[in-house]
Structure formats: C-alpha cells, structure tokens
Amino acid sequence: MLMEMNRYLSFTLFTGLSLLTTIPIEAYTLNPNKTATSILQTNVIEVRSITSVQPIVIYCPVGTVPQLPYQVWVTYSDGQGEYRQTKWSNSALSTEQSEADDKVYPIGSQYTINGFIIGDDTTENGYPITAKIEVVDTKNTISPKLIAHTIPLNNVKINGNNRLTSNRDLAIKEIISWDVSQQLYNYRDTYGLSTEGYTRSDGWDSPETKLKGHGSGHYMSALALAYAAATNPSHKEILRRNITRMVNELRECQERTFVWSEELGRYLEARDFAPEEELKKMKGTWEAFDEHKTKWATYGYGYLNAIPPHHPALIEMYRAYNNSDWVWAPYYSIHKQLAGLIDIATYMDDKSIADKALLIAKDMGLWVWNRMHYRTYVKKDGTQEERRTHPGNRYEMWNMYIAGEVGGMGESLARLSEMVSAPEEKARLIEASNCFDSPAFYEPLSKNIDDIRNRHANQHIPMIIGALRSYLSNNDTFYYHVSHNFWNLIQGSYRYSTGGVGNGEMFRQPYTK
C-alpha cells in the first residue's frame, strides 16, 4: 500500500509591526517500498528594520513643556515608511514642571529629550530617538480656521430600506414608548405641584437619587433628535406632543420662582438664595430635602431643576459626593437639562415651543450666572484649608471628585450665548460658561504640563469640550491651548488600542496603558 504525506509548515515571525521571515517547508513523501527522502525548501524574506527617523526639532514657547510628537515618521530598510507611536522620557510630573519653569529653561535654552519608538526590538524599550528642544519667545500658533464641523441633524436625510433607516425607526419607536409623565414627576414634586396621575421616576432619576433630572435632560435631547430625524408622520406627531408637554410643564414650574420682593425692589434672584450663614448650616440629608422642596418660592428667578437649589448650593460648602448625606454631581444634572432644552430649541420647527424652550434655558442659564457672579470666586494660593475658608471658591469646587463634576456646563452655556440676541445676556452667559473652568486642571494644561494623571475621566473630558466651545465663542486662545494640549497628551500617553483612554472611569499614569 502506497502512503503519501505532504506537509507544509509556515512560520511567520514579527517584531513589533515589522515582518521578519516567512518559511514554507515541504516536509517529505513516504513510500514503504522506497527509501524515505525529505526536501526542505526555504524562502526567506529580507528582515525589515527601521533605518531612519524624521528629525525631531521642537521650538518650545518659554514657560511651557515641549509638545513632543506622539507619532513620528520612520523609514524601513525596504524603503517603505509609516507613522509609529512614541514614548518619551520626560513624563514624570516633576520633570515637566521643571521644563515649564522659565528660570530653569529661559529663552534661548537648548536641550534634548530622549525617547523610543515602541514595538521595536532594537533595544529593550524600543528604537531610540532624540528630540532637540529650543526655547523661544513666541506663543503657540493657532489654527486659523475650523477644519471640520458637525452638520445639523435636520439637514441630514437617510432614505431607503436599509440598516440605517431600520435602526433609526427602531430608536424612535423606543423613544415614543416612554412615559412623558414619568419625566415630569420630579419637577412637579420639587415645585409643590400635584403628582397625581404622574408615573413615579425610577433608577438614577428616582426621587431618592440626587442625580435626578439628568435622565429627563437626556430624554429631552432624545425627543429633539428623534423629531429632527423622524420621517413617519405619526411618529413625528407623538414626538411633537411630548415635546410640547415637557416644555409647557417645565415653564409652569419655572414661573413659580418669579417672586417679587418689595424689600429689594426686584425679583428674588439666585444670589439671594441661602445667605452665607444659612449656607454654612445647610443640611444635605433626605429629611432636609423634604423640607427644602417646600420652599420653592425662595429658589430665585429662573431656577429650573428636578431637585431644589440647595443641591448646587451645597457644593459651595465643598460638601462631598454622598447621595444620602450631601451631593451627587449637582451641575452635571443641570447641564443635561440645559442641553435637552437647547436641543429642543434647535430642532423643533414649532417656533412657539422652540422659543419657549430657549426662554427656559436662558432663564436657568442666567440663574447660574447670577449665582456664580455674586456668590463664588477663585482663590488659587495657600493650602486647601485656606482656600476653603470661605464658601464658593471655584478652584476647590470643581476640583472635587464627582461632587465637582459639572458635565458640559461650559459647553452648553457657551452654546446658549450664541442663541440669545441681547448683548448683556450674551456677555453674562459667556461669563457663566467660563465660571466652570477648573483652574487646577486648566492652568497646568495651558503650559502642556500633564496634570491629567489619576483624574476622573468622565468629569474632565466634558470640561475640555467646554473649553474648546468657549474658544469658539470668546476667541480667547487660552482655551484653545488647553484643548489642544489635552488632545495631544491623551493620544500619546493614555490612549488604549481600543480607543478608550481610562480604566474604571479614571485616567491612570502616562504610558501605563
């Protein structure tokens, strides 16, 4: 009996991303009547290695950390080239702080920073590279124009019978199935209105959760975006009815704060709510909040939220994240509600409802301005205890874990400033937007110092989006540099291969991904 066996083996070896060798092996043919023979055939491809790297010369503005490239162009021995990821040796915080010190590196200083191209086995750490740094007396350059911007959803149409249209319609059907009364329950409870016939809220918007209202904000955004995308007339009509009901009932709640003070000769405002001595004694328990919500007449003109203003006021006393006793991200929830109203004002084609949604958002935005302008400040120097001597230091407020999480307040208030027409209101809303700057976070970033490490990613990414939106609204280049530096640091030091940048909602240490 003749038995023949052909085996083909192929070995492919990689170093980093570079293909080294492919070896197909035709092993042998066996015949019991013949002497066994074997033939080994090899086909070796020349090893590819990095032969050169594009020179790295950085002209670094004095008082800043060099903006080192997170990718560099390399050329291989086969003549091909590509961008490869880098890792630099100056990532220690103390090193960066020294590089940003104009006394250590004055104008005209020259020095080098070593690094590696990762994924290469030239050395244990990778292919060695060096950046030459020269400190110069110039400012960072500004991108002269927008490279890209979003297209308004109501200018986009998806046609035909396909997965996109199917998913759109499924999403809209889900949104119109939600009970609008459930989204209004907490507001009515907060403003002393009857909740009879209204479905009680649940989950993270339940009456026992201080994050309540954030889900209703998402709901309003969902209604607005679904309305802009809907093509089915019956779906569009249901969405219109739900939007109209939300807007009308929220305005009813808000108008209960329009309380005239004969003593002051004006309406009660945010600055009048909880004078300092009262604020210092304010409690954050649920028993206290049961009492707080009976005092809606003191909330201040324009306040609109699913929880009384005691919640955002408590952060002025630096109260910690604690759903039972203190706070849970007060301004995070306010942002979601502002964003939802702004989305309705943007996408609703019923002008009366769109205008009313904008009016609600504007009045709430001006409540925020009033509170920030008159009752808060920024003090950066001293110890934490010294910075917290008096209520309302935003340096401390926005640097607190979760309690100081403000979502996209900066972005929404800047966006709102672009939608109102009165110059004074525009100016106040931009000021309010910038009140949500975090000096402890922004100022190191403005110098390209990586103070991202170990921060709460969910809390700080929206701040950067707010900074970029502020730049578009006020043309202050400080905000551009903060945003631009953040992006480069994230791409080079924190981005995982999946595209994520955090672990457990937290940034970790640079290059530990």
What are these regions (language model features)?
Residues 78-134:
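Serine/threonine-rich, repeat-prone extracellular segments and beta-strand-based repeat modules
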Residues 63, 79-81, 122, 302, ...:
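Detector for glycine-centered tight turns/loop "hinges" at secondary-structure junctions
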Residues 134-140:
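Extracellular interdomain linker/stem segments of modular secreted and single-pass surface proteins
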Residues 43-81:
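Solvent-exposed, low-complexity, repeat-rich "mucin-like" stalks and linkers
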Residues 2-12:
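Bacterial N-terminal signal peptides that target proteins for export
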Residues 140-513:
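Glycan-recognition and catalytic cores of secretory/periplasmic carbohydrate-active enzymes
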Residues 12-22:
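Bacterial N-terminal signal peptides
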Residues 27-48:
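Low-complexity, acidic Ser/Thr/Pro-rich repeat tracts that form intrinsically disordered stalk/linker regions
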